[in-house]
Structures are given as structure tokens and as C-alpha cells.
Amino acid sequence: MNSISKVRKLGKYFLIIDNMFVVIGFYAVFPLISIHFVEQLGWTAFLVGFALGLRQFIQQGLGIIGGAFADKLGAKPMIVSGLFMRTIGFIIMSLAHTPTLLCAACILSALGGTLFDPPRTALVIKLIRPWKLGRFYSILMLEDSICAIIGITLGSWLLQQYNFQLVCLTGAILFFIAGMFNAWRLPAYKISSSHLSLLDGIKQVLHNQKFIIYTLTLSGYYILSAQVMLMLPIRMHEISGQLSYIKYIYITEAILSLLLIIPITYWMEKYFKLETRLMLGLVIMIISLSPIGSVNNLYELLILISLFYIGSIVAEPARETLSALLTNYKARSSYIGFNKLSLALGGTLGYSGGGWLYDLGKELNFYQLPWIALSIIGTITVLILYYQFRYCSIQPSLYTD
């Protein structure tokens, strides 16, 4: 095995181990924020959604800056410092008893994510061959699902048996371990293959108008995805009346991922373009969300959640691969960072807007309101994507170094 192939293989295993700590730490805390503050403490869904949206907006909105620094300084210092910063954010969240403290914790967690997220994503693109990206993203999705179950089960148990403070401290410990692991084992990889200055990397992205429009359009996709952390857990708790039942959302995701993600991804790679897979998955997600406000049966809710995850299984590997192949190796992290802007906008609107619509629907006794609004947003997103792919010649190209 030549040295380059060996580096790629070892790098792949490193990414999988690192991802395990990060995902478990994330899911041990974030899905329970809405439950703790809305259901247990009685805060409004809008207020909690605003804090979650603020975290999303800062982390992903500043992604292009974090990515540009990673292009210039390398992956390791950005990833390690970002993981430690999120550790501190979770410690502060364990002390949050006012909206101000919650927002401060979310901001610090977001800044940590701004530092570690773009270079981690760029490492995947650097270490995995372009034609293998789709399958590797499928493996990561499968791992995400399994680790999400571990995280949410751990967090739910700690919340039931002890308190939210211990939930946050457990998440902090996991991110601290991830930071130490990266400091110890992550080589000093250079992500970018050119010597562009910080501003030149950002300018290169901003001159690619088609990439910018595509990125902004994906905000609609993330508005729907954000509900996994906000309204789906709340709806599950409303119908079941049991805090412990929230984990079934993520158990459903894990089971479907184990059974379907590899065969669906392999089969769709043979017969469908990336663009078609992205739009088809989004349509399935829309169909699943539409009736959620009307169901009052736990089994019906789980069926709709299952359909939502099937749509995600179809769309997400295609979206990740398409976004990766639209980047330029000369400013890889800058492209990845800017692409996170769609997650920033979509997450902010999905959390704060979803929380506001939930409160409004409850006030008007019209519980279907947020779900109908989500369906409309998703439909508009599909139509805009179709127009771009059909008429604006947005096509992936296999940039490589």
C-alpha cells in the first residue's frame, strides 16, 4: 500500500472515531433542551427556539470565516480549539436558569462549532476519493443514527434520574474527550491545496454566484430538518405523555438507517442523478410532515416520522455529495464554510419560526399550523431547486488535488 493510500485509509478510520464522540455529545444534550426548558420549566417554545436558532445561525453563518482560517492555518488547531470551546459552552448551559445564560451557552457552543465544523467536513472531502464520497457519507449517516440513539438514550436517562445539569456536563465531557483525541492523534493536515490568502479564499467563493444561490436555496431543506430537534420531540411528548418516549424518534432513525441507508444509496447511485435524489427525498419529507399536527396516535406519529427519515436517507447523501463536488479544492474549507450558511438560515428560521408558529397554533387552537407552513416552505424549495438544476446549469464537477 503506497503512502497516500495509507494516509487516506487511516484518515477514514480517524474520521469515524472522531465523529462518534462528537455526535454522542451533541445528541446527549441538544434534543433535550426543548423538553427541559419548554415542557419542564414552562418557557415558551419561541424563546427556546430563538436560543437554538441563534446557535445555528452563529455557527453556520460564520462558517465561511472559520473555513477560511482553516484553509490558512490547517485543520488541527481549528478543530481542537473548537471542541474545547463547545465543552465550555455546555458547562455554562448546565448553569442556565435564565434566557440570557441559555443564549450565552448557545453562542459559545456555536463559536466552537464555527471553528471545528468546516475543517472536519473538508477533511472528508480531502481524504475520500470523489467517487466514493456518496458511500462514505452513507456510512457517516449510519454512524450518526446509531450514535444519536446512544446520545439521546444517555441524555434522557440522566434527565429522568438526575437533572439537566448532569446532562450538560456529560456532553461537555464527551466534547473534551474529542478535543483531546484530536490533539493527540490528528496529523497537521493542510486542507487547501493552494496558498490563497484569507480574503482571497472568501472572494473566490463569493464570485461563484451559482454556488451562492444553490446554498441559499438549501435553507428550505434545513428548515424542515431542524424540527428533529424542536417540534418532533415536543409532539412526541404531547402524544405519549412520557419523556422516555422521545428516544423512539432516534431509535426509528437508527433502525431505518441500519436497514435502508446502504441499499438505498447504492441503488439510487445507479439509476438517479444527485439532483433527482435530493429533490425526491425532500418531497418525501414534505409528505410526512404535512399531517403530523392532526395525528393523536403514537403509532401513526411513528409512521410519519419513519417516512420523514426515509426522505432524509434519500436526500442527505445526495445533498452532501453535491455540495462537496461543487467546491473548489483551492479554497475547500471556505466553500464548505459558506455552504453552512444554508444551515444557518434554515436552522434559525426553523427553530425560531417553528417555535413561534407552534405557540401561535396552540393559542389559536390550530395545531396543524406549523406543519402546514413547513409543507409550503418545502414545496417552494423543491420548485426553486428544480428550476436551478433544469435551467441554470448547476452541475457538480470533480475538482481534485
Swiss-Prot record:
The chain crosses the membrane at residues 13-33, 34-54, 88-108, 139-159, 164-184, 211-231, 248-268, 275-295, 298-318, 341-361, 366-386. Coiled coil: none annotated. CDD domains: MFS_MdtH_MDR_like. Its main location: membrane. GO terms for molecular function: transmembrane transporter activity. The keyword Cell membrane applies. Belongs to the major facilitator superfamily. DHA1 family. MdtH (TC 2.A.1.2.21) subfamily. This is Multidrug resistance protein MdtH. The gene is mdtH.
